[in-house]
């Protein structure tokens, strides 16, 4: 019963009562809670690191546990739905039931280890040799502590694990080995309408707005389990006509690969694609071998995987496997996922690559199809290839005419993605096989854009002038680094932001957008003359021209950029010359006449219109039809002070005949297009108007040739211009500044010094002492034993007490600084003696 005794009020509130015990219990609870939280976070991080870098399918129990954790324990926003993490048990053994796999994971590796060390150690053991060794690294290049060792077959990995008893000693440290099993991902969902992969939390497609439920209902049978093996293909589930070679040396060439594979298969240079870095031009470590069929590829793969010792090229062990894509965008009926982006971009890259390779004759066997109809694996990608057939054919046609840009500029293909996939059999046919019409495919697959007319359904690079199109959206254009221009994926045109013109690579024609007609219209004929025409355009060429026509040269994106730049420069130069002909005179040649300024403003405002730009030819026609010539005596008059000087007038009159520009019958100035009431007004306008002089100068400049105009411009620039004199004339000479005042020394005020000459008998103190019996000259005190002179005010040294030696140097308050220094010097000198 003692434990049931209630605590009294005094004990609860006492200084050393149970409050101290309660605080101790709270501290223990906090420490326990913090320890559990840290243990939980450590287990989460450990689990995430392990799950993120497993490469192959996990057991069913792990899949169900991961699915429940993602779908139940996490909310839509990505965070855990249950806030009490301590209710969960994280102390699970992840390695209780490992599924055997041909990939082995090495954990607990030293930080300073590299792939070569692991590869040499693994290859030093007797038995099966690994196909590939991958060490996971951080961004800094250091090891993350784990690596993957992949074998060719499952029995090789299991026998190697049993031989080493799941342990390995590297640099004196025991390393644990486990089978690598992946964790499938179920977060994202695929839109069946547009083929876009959306996040799990989206209820509608980000591109087309289709509901998520529609895609779930339209999913093919067996697609629910397809994601489990979508990212990784099993040993017997995926075959391809292409083989990937890993661990290629940085300086290995195609000839070395051909010589290494020569004992097993007969290949040519066009069957091998060696991937290189664009910046360093060195190999990126892998290459692709394209074979005629998937059957031959599987046979070659089986031969290379069973080699003992394994295949080596330039001293490096080569890993061999089917070329496969790790990107998932399209779900096929058999459960595989194929990237829509990779299919289209790889098709374009393959077309560009094949067009640059030397043409092989049909008898040599070098022109192979990726996958032919009826072969194994082609049915898996038939639907995907048909969807992208129009776009692929258009890009291939552009490559054949030599006007398509480089593959990496229009549709870049990541080097890390395996670049060999099944293409449509229509593009790569064996000699003699029938081909389908590309135009029918384009017409069948092209669909008009939403909100536009049916005429807008033209395929890319098939712009027809006159048809209506949607307003171009420059925000969707893709920048082409190789050419420096922007590519429109909808129309296939190249856009130059400087000249705002479009370039059609198929027709080699320059276009511009007409907002009123909602269409692309061709530019002027003379504007596109600088563009390069297709080879073989003239039917009457010689035999050499026919031979060149048979071998068209590939026109790269750099050549297209040079053509557009040259054409834009010619247009800008024409515009600049036309604007220079209408440039007004310089500021010093402008006068202060208000009427002339107003007239010139109107003239400058109207000169931009097309009708006003044609006034010079109209004026010349009127001058040529003039029959009678006015008398020259009417022009003799004196210029006013506001007009130009005599040299300028002589230059104007000598260069241009002013009389041809006057209509004396209608009393009008043909140059300024003004009519006057009488002859005197017309004469004054001719002689005094600044507007007439400026227009005359513009007309004179328009008649000059380009060389004469440049010479005149150079002469004007070289002529010295006294701008200071112009400012003095216009604004006047400023007044000189006021002289600076002299600084006067401050006046010295003499203060009163009543005791400077001594104290006389008239002061009050002297009178008081005399009243008490004191006489002048006697000392103070009863017996006159005191001082006889008055006390002098003296300056003491700082810090010295009264009466201390050296406390006073005999300096008085009335002494000057010079006297005080001299007395202090003498006092210190006497102290030293």
Swiss-Prot record:
It is found in: Nucleus. The keyword Metal-binding applies. A zinc finger (C2H2-type) spans 667-692. GO terms for cellular component: nucleus; spliceosomal complex. GO terms for molecular function: mRNA binding; RNA binding; zinc ion binding. Residues 102-182, 241-325 form the RRM domain. CDD domains: OCRE_RBM5 (cd16168), RRM1_RBM5 (cd12752), RRM2_RBM5 (cd12755). GO terms for biological process: mRNA splicing, via spliceosome; positive regulation of apoptotic process; regulation of alternative mRNA splicing, via spliceosome; spliceosomal complex assembly. Its main location: nucleus. Residues 429-458 have a biased composition (Low complexity). Belongs to the RBM5/RBM10 family. This is RNA-binding protein 5-A. It comes from Xenopus laevis.
